[in-house]
Amino acid sequence: MSEPDRIVSAVQRGEDIDTTMRPQSLDEFVGQKTARANLKVFIEAARSRGEALDHVLFVGPPGLGKTTLAQIMARELGVNFRSTSGPVIAKAGDLAALLTNLEERDVLFIDEIHRLNPAVEEILYPAMEDYQLDLIIGEGPAARSVKIDLAKFTLVAATTRLGLLTTPLRDRFGIPIRLEFYTVDELQAIVTRGARIMGMPLAEDGAEEIARRARGTPRIAGRLLRRVRDFAYVAGAENVTRQIADAALSRLEVDALGLDQLDRRYLHMIVENFGGGPVGIETIAAALSEPRDAIEDIIEPYLIQQGFIQRTPRGRVLAAKAWRHLGLNPPKELAQSQINLFEEE
């Protein structure tokens, strides 16, 4: 099963791009209370001074609203919004074309900035710091350096892997913001709003059931809501209750805590093949036939956040909660070995 095929994948699909479902202002945006409060201050200050907002870096797992927040920022600043992603900017000319078309105070959003070509990144430094492009025109003896003045713009970038950003690039962002997983209450509010927009009758306990299985991620909550709507429609349900939501999500193999077949396979593999751990990430990747990056970026963050696994110097170890979730009793010797592992950290 590839990552995009999972219904609980936070990777964006075409069906997830529904502009009617997206909040249009910071006041409408649910969750990320600290980030929203700080952004309001920074936006109001920049708007009052008539200046470009400092460059912003959003850090966090996929599906938490980084793109939506960038769009809201541009809307509340009253400026144009341009969007691209790191892998798309293949060469310096691509970046130059983007930057030279920006107007004063415009917002340029670069998703997956950690995947930016290193040669392109070098061009970005003076653009961010001095609002200048420093390009080499021509080759050999005829080559010459050309400086191009740029409009004072705001770069808003997003990354799921802060550690892959170079220090010079990371240090040029004046406003770093880390986004966190959402609470069940926040996701319930998002699901309720989505159902209202879709004209879908949804009981409070039905919204809560969907929210509890959405892995702390609004994008997944929206996807689960659409699939539950399909099941409810075919079943002729007039109102989506907890019972209907539970039946639909169980059919989709999403359990009560939001784990799917791949998550359970991950946990079962560590129990059955390695006695609960510790086991190294490369071994896990080989056993699951999944790329290491996918495991570290997509599967493990939620399992760690839920307290199912721990990363130790000797590898991954299942916590007692994971054993119980699988219907198993954690061995006493494993509990003792976990204590010893954390004493070594």
Swiss-Prot record:
Please tell me where this protein is predominantly located. Answer: cytoplasm
SUPFAM superfamilies according to UniProt: P-loop containing nucleoside triphosphate hydrolases, Winged helix' DNA-binding domain
Statement: the UniProt record of this protein carries the keyword Phosphoprotein: no
Q: Which InterPro entries match?
A: AAA+_ATPase, AAA_lid_4, DNA_helicase_Holl-junc_RuvB, P-loop_NTPase, RuvB-like_N, RuvB_C, WH-like_DNA-bd_sf, WH_DNA-bd_sf
Residues annotated for DNA binding in this entry: R292, R311, R316
Q: Where is this region: Head domain (RuvB-H)?
A: 256-345
From which residue to which does the signal peptide run? Answer: none
GO BP field: DNA recombination; DNA repair
The record's section on Gene3D superfamilies has: 1.10.8.60, P-loop containing nucleotide triphosphate hydrolases, Winged helix-like DNA-binding domain superfamily/Winged helix DNA-binding domain
Catalytic reactions on record: ATP + H2O = ADP + phosphate + H(+)
Q: Where in the cell is it found?
A: Cytoplasm
- What's the entry's take on its domains? Has 3 domains, the large (RuvB-L) and small ATPase (RuvB-S) domains and the C-terminal head (RuvB-H) domain. The head domain binds DNA, while the ATPase domains jointly bind ATP, ADP or are empty depending on the state of the subunit in the translocation cycle. During a single DNA translocation step the structure of each domain remains the same, but their relative positions change.
Record's subunit section = Homohexamer. Forms an RuvA(8)-RuvB(12)-Holliday junction (HJ) complex. HJ DNA is sandwiched between 2 RuvA tetramers; dsDNA enters through RuvA and exits via RuvB. An RuvB hexamer assembles on each DNA strand where it exits the tetramer. Each RuvB hexamer is contacted by two RuvA subunits (via domain III) on 2 adjacent RuvB subunits; this complex drives branch migration. In the full resolvosome a probable DNA-RuvA(4)-RuvB(12)-RuvC(2) complex forms which resolves the HJ.
Task: Describe the function of this protein.
Answer: The RuvA-RuvB-RuvC complex processes Holliday junction (HJ) DNA during genetic recombination and DNA repair, while the RuvA-RuvB complex plays an important role in the rescue of blocked DNA replication forks via replication fork reversal (RFR). RuvA specifically binds to HJ cruciform DNA, conferring on it an open structure. The RuvB hexamer acts as an ATP-dependent pump, pulling dsDNA into and through the RuvAB complex. RuvB forms 2 homohexamers on either side of HJ DNA bound by 1 or 2 RuvA tetramers; 4 subunits per hexamer contact DNA at a time.
Its family remark reads: Belongs to the RuvB family.
According to UniProt, the name of this protein is: Holliday junction branch migration complex subunit RuvB
Q: Which organism is it from?
A: Chelativorans sp. (strain BNC1)
